[in-house]
Regions:
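Acidic/polar surface patches and capping/hinge elements
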Residues: 1-228
Length: 228
């Protein structure tokens, strides 16, 4: 987006309001979502989380040993490809994080919208990563993982529940179980968690979701294809 334009102003205000550490607009559920999918580098990480979800939803599908190997290879491959795509994009465009924009750079955008103003005391709800914002790694990993699992199962419509693997790191997540009616719903929630957490712009999420799905579609069509 043009940082002086209305689309940027809307995204700036959205993350400023919802993603602040002391936000009064973020709901309890949105706060839970931000923590549930945080998956920082000191824990399971997003690729590890989606490998765990894959194991959970595939374990009762009566897969053979070879089918299991194929599934894990495809899912692992797409997670690796997602990281390459996302981080290549991050350092190609070098877009600043919301926390930097809100605390330091807002006046430089020359945006006439009064919502685009500097707040030196603003803090993100979850820790802001130390690398560029665009696009979202979380959203790329999530979309790629969910799409590949859907390819393997032949459907996106999977009802499942899941507990966070980061309960030691985030004790507030103990006994918290989240429920979804589709794999894509879980992937979108995973990506939106970064807006609720104050570390990504909405555009980071939306573009990354499309990239992740494309990565999975390409890998499924070309690699480890079943023998007829």
């Amino acid at each position: 987006h043009d940082p002086a334009g209305p689309e940027f102003a809307r995204e700036f205000d959205q993350v400023r309001v919802l993603g602040a550490a002391d936000s009064r607009e973020r709901t309890a559920d949105q706060s839970e979502i931000a923590m549930f999918w945080e998956d920082g580098p000191w824990g399971i990480t997003p690729p590890g989380h989606y490998m765990l979800i894959a194991i959970q939803v595939l374990q009762d599908r009566n897969l053979s040993f070879v089918e299991w190997a194929r599934a894990m290879a495809l899912i692992g491959m797409t997670q690796c490809d997602a990281s390459i795509q996302a981080w290549d994009t991050k350092y190609r465009y070098d877009v600043i994080r919301p926390e930097t924009a809100i605390r330091h750079r807002a006046p430089k955008f020359d945006n006439p919208d009064p919502r685009v103003e500097r707040d030196s005391q603003w803090r993100s709800y979850i820790p802001t990563p130390e690398f560029p914002s665009y696009t979202s790694g979380h959203s790329t990993f999530g979309a790629a993982g969910a799409r590949m699992i859907a390819h393997i199962l032949g459907t996106d419509q999977v009802n499942f529940s899941h507990q966070s693997p980061a309960q030691v790191l985030w004790p507030r997540l103990r006994d918290i179980t989240r429920h979804w009616t589709s794999l894509s719903q879980a992937a979108d929630e995973n990506g939106m968690s970064r807006i609720y957490g104050g570390v990504h712009w909405m555009r980071d999420h939306l573009v990354a979701m499309e990239a992740g799905k494309a990565i999975a579609d390409h890998a499924h069509a070309r690699y480890f294809r079943r023998r007829v």
